[in-house]
């Protein structure tokens, strides 16, 4: 089979990019030919002679992400239409190109985020808020257009699948394929608190996510921490410039108990160095970091508003009904902190659960879907990089 995957980046250190990276690897393992229509592709994939890269260059001079995404959508569609005879299965990700697709993977549903009671943006709340509101509304319309024109839709969680149905999309063509996780890398890492300057004797929580917006809900975690014993500390990993949370932590008197680490490259070691993972996100499609934490053997505290919470059992975590209830969050954390043995037992159950969510398992499901949709074609020879249509003019 000849597969085309359309996505902005294909690399192992990006959420959506990692998913497509592993899908490409799974397809190559079946001796399929893979064309990647993307702005960036990991060099190790390009070393494979069955990989062709169609680089879609989008200049940073375009005034906003909304415009840049349209440039990508138009350029990719031009190439795909011009080369329609060169592939059997077209796999896209949400709205990303002005073209009908065979497979469409939904990583995030803008319409679901807009309907969430925690959606914070509006036209009358300032220029940035107004832009975010317009961005969401435009993308809601675009994703509905894309899903209606896709033969098969794969959602990364049941929450995402339900939200796509809420857009009026035929549920018969929607299936759930959960993202994978490198279970071995996280389970086999060695703890090293000293490497992150973390206290050796504290009961240590971990929060990973975007620290510049309230959606991930670090604020509620900080409020909960104020009511917990002094030996309960919090490590926070995420991009710090522009974040209000360091000041908020100091204002709450938590300056010595909250450890802001910035961006962390060695996440397996960090996750193996803490006691539990806390992630009461107000809205999440499917969190890779949640899966990684469980693979590292951490019990998790999350909320029903976070996609992926549906897979968490009582044996391996605690799922809250309300992400904005600091008292309930504190009680859940306190339950874990009160018994290290029970905490470790829940972590072991989490690790066992993640053994069934490997990247290979995810990739095999996409390969099976490709087989059902595509028809074998005679292989064609091509080089690694296609420049004709998609290069930005200088």
How would you label these PLM feature ranges?
Residues 17-22, 203, 207, 212-227:
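A conserved mid-protein helix/loop that constitutes part of the nucleotide-sugar donor-binding site
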Residues 144-176, 181-185:
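A short, active-site helix/loop in glycosyltransferases that binds the activated sugar's phosphate group
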Residues 187-199, 342, 379-384:
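A short helix/loop element that forms part of the nucleotide-sugar donor recognition site in Leloir-type
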Residues 208-213, 233-246:
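Glycosyltransferase donor-sugar binding loop
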Residues 263, 282:
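Aromatic "clamp/platform" in nucleotide-sugar-dependent glycosyltransferases that forms part
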Residues 299-302:
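Short hydrophobic beta-strand element within catalytic cores of glycosyltransferases
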Residues 335, 342-356, 365-368:
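A short, well-ordered alpha-helix in the C-terminal region of glycosyltransferases
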